[in-house]
Amino acid sequence: MHADQRKKLTVLMINMFIAVGSFGIIIPILPAYLASIGQGGTAAGLMIAIFAGAQLVMSPIAGKWADQYGRRKMIIYGLIGLTLSMFVFYFSNSVTVLYISRAIGGAGAALLIPAIFAYVADITTMDQRAKGNSYVSAAMSLGIVIGPGIGGFLAEYDLKLPLLVSAIVSGAAVLFSVLLLQESEKHDATAMAPDEGSMLKKLGTSFKKPYFVPLVITLVMSFGLMAYESVLGLFVDDQFGASPKDIAIMVTSTGIISVIAQIFIVDKLSRSLGEGKVLNLFLFIAALGFLLSLLTSSYGGFFAITLVIFLATSILRPVLNTMISKLAGNEQGFAMGMNNAYMSIGNVLGPTLAGVLYDVNILYPFALGLIFLVVTFIGSFIWQKRQARLIAKVEQSS
């Protein structure tokens, strides 16, 4: 990459890091904060579902807007939405208003994330795209690692301080983007997918796209990962008697593994094997991880298996983004919006079903994730066989 590409990519990485990190700051204090206003697990679950639901509803629209009005505007508006969400969260003690803040935050994330990945597609060649997507995904993973750590530290001084700091940091990201982020030169407002009206119609339109199967894989991966994450703490506590410190170490370790994989592994694997083979390989590894999680009898073994699962998903995410981007052609905003929409569907359904199944049997969420991943692996293998010529063409593009 030349200097101008690296500069723009750095700005995008900083934005993604701040956006994800500012949300991650509130994670350690969420249970105690909800308890302080007389709320518990139901409210926590609804906050996740509302955030993901708003993201789902807005994502197709946001993708179209990114194509029509430009990536820069959507990135800035998305950051404004996240900032407003955090300020509403900080100043409110009403659970209803907190739900509203999560809806605003979800809408902001829907504007921000597809626009960032569409921007990456604009400033990179086909050959560079895997590296660009993996760097932005690494910034996301780094935010997930560092945000909660900062939140836990700030909460030692005041329970609501992480909320205020999160809002201020998000606001700084808005100013940062206004001053430093330029519109991507390849953005073409005329190169858009046709306007199909409602979100459901846009989802229907995606069925006909060449990147539909990667979108479905994105949904399944998000479903499995969020289902896994949502019961992870409960499972290691119930099954192995893990302490909060043990759980924190596990979560931090998975984030570190994700960052390392996305910076140092994804691009090399994609170049040597091609996105299609990497996709199948790590779908298989993720499924194997879910299978082993059903069989392990020790905390150490489960810890190691969890690292393997997160390693697989951290590689799958940028690989899928790259494959969708290459297959999308001039519909980058629409494609990334649909990518975010399918991811949001998984983020809503995963924790919801996992929680219900966990109350029946603590192993059922892992069994369900295994079934979904096996079916997806088989589907991906068959799809790639049928579309071998198209996939080979986009993998060889530069």
What annotation goes with each model-predicted range?
Residues S59-G70, A261-G274, Y358:
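Helix-to-loop junctions at the C-terminal end of transmembrane segments
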Residues G276-L320:
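C-terminal transmembrane helical hairpin of 12-TM major facilitator-type secondary transporters
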Residues P28-G41, V231-D246:
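Short amphipathic helix-loop junctions that connect adjacent transmembrane helices
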Residues V57-N93:
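Conserved MFS/SLC helix-loop-helix module at the cytosolic interface between two early adjacent transmembrane helices
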Residues G38, G70, F91-V97, G108, ...:
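Helix-breaking motifs and short loop linkers at transmembrane-helix boundaries and internal kinks
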Residues M1-R6, Q182-L215, S398:
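Juxtamembrane intracellular "pre-TM" segments in multi-pass secondary transporters
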Residues S101-L142:
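Cytoplasmic helix-loop-helix junction between adjacent transmembrane helices
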